[in-house]
A protein has these predicted regions:
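The conserved phosphate-sensing helix
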Residues: 198-212
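Short regulatory helix/loop adjacent to the ATP-binding pocket of P-loop NTPases
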Residues: 141-156
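Conserved P-loop NTPase "ATPase switch" module shared by AAA+ and STAND
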Residues: 94-118, 122, 129-138
């Protein structure tokens, strides 16, 4: 087993990253993306947005939905941020035999010369085999540093959606929505405190909530303001 195979085996989906746990207010691009990605008839889609808009969550949710609906056929989630320094051919080899492939954080490799032809060829193999291919990045295809025109053409060949940054009110509801899923009650006061003291980024906020969940479960404590301040040291 080579280094890449060892790493790929170690990649685990976050079991909290499901469609049920994805906060997507009706009428927002997040809601549209959720509906689009749940539709397994869409063979290729490209979703972009800034950090914290839910891209990785959505990709993992699609894989987990696929796993619960089908008894056979593989769903593959590749976080390119972790895999970008491995040989592209090695990373993408044979994946077109899967039912579903999710490439997360394409920005990490889009401007690399050694990834251009392998990505283009992989697109073609997926198209020929009917493999569903989903891609995320932080910007629309035209703004990526893609070096191969044919690859850019492939990236633009399907539906592209751009997610929006969550507003403070959305982040508060997102925190409370996720807390409820963990069996926790998060008051408006505590949620606002977290937004005031922590970066307004869903990744950071969810990590804080998971830490609070672990300690509150262990100590059988409610999420009061003093408790939250102590646990997070803020």
């Amino acid at each position: 087993v080579n280094d890449f195979q060892q790493l790929s085996l170690a990649i685990k989906l976050d079991n909290q990253a499901t469609f049920d746990n994805f906060y997507a207010p009706t009428g927002t691009p997040q809601h549209l993306a959720k509906m689009l990605l749940q539709d397994e008839g869409k063979q290729y889609a490209y979703v972009c947005g800034s950090s914290g808009t839910g891209l990785s969550h959505l990709m993992q949710a699609v894989c987990q939905q696929h796993g619960t609906r089908l008894s056979n056929g593989a769903a593959v989630y590749l976080p390119l941020k972790e895999l970008c320094d491995y040989p592209a051919d090695q990373v993408l080899e044979g994946l077109e035999s899967s039912d579903l492939v999710c490439l997360d954080d394409l920005d990490q490799v889009a401007g690399r010369e050694e990834w251009q032809a392998p990505l283009f060829n992989f697109f073609n193999r997926c198209s020929e085999s009917g493999t569903r291919l989903l891609i995320t990045a932080h910007t629309l295809p035209d703004y990526l540093e893609v070096l191969l025109d044919d690859l850019l053409s492939r990236l633009k060949s399907g539906i592209s959606l751009q997610l929006i940054d969550y507003k403070d009110a959305d982040l508060r509801r997102l925190l409370q929505h996720r807390a409820s899923g963990l069996g926790l009650y998060l008051s408006d006061e505590v949620a606002r405190f977290l937004l005031h003291r922590l970066p307004r980024n869903s990744h950071v906020l969810m990590e804080a909530l998971e830490k609070l969940d672990g300690v509150s479960l262990r100590e059988q404590r409610r999420l009061t303001l003093p408790f939250v301040k102590t646990v997070l040291d803020i």
